[in-house]
Curated annotation (Swiss-Prot):
GO terms for biological process: antimicrobial humoral immune response mediated by antimicrobial peptide; defense response to Gram-negative bacterium; innate immune response. The keyword Signal applies. This is Beta-defensin 127. It comes from the Eukaryota. It comes from Pan troglodytes (Chimpanzee). It is found in: Secreted. Disulfide bonds join 24-53, 33-47, 37-54.
Amino acid sequence: MGLFMIIAILLFQKPTVTEQLKKCWNNYVQGHCRKICRVNEVPEALCENGRYCCLNIKELEACKKITKPSHPKPATLALTLQDYVTIIENFPSLKTQST
C-alpha cells in the first residue's frame, strides 16, 4: 500500500520550472528554450537559463515578410521664385570681388 501511495504522489506532481519548456522571443514569433535546436529551428538568442531560444524558420520568415516596413520616398525640394531671388541677391557678384 505504501508503494502505491508513493507512485500516486509522483504521478500527480507538477514538473518544476526547469523541466518545463520555456517560451522565449517576442509577441510575434514564439520560440522554445532548448539545449539543441531542432532541424527546422534556428537559434536566435540565449534564454535566461543559458539555453538557446530556438525559433521555427517558417514562422520567422513569415514574420519578416509581414513586418518589413516599406521604404519612404525621398523628400523633394521645391523652390519658389522668391527663393531663387533671395539666393541670387545674397550671392556675391563677380564685379564686387574683382574691385
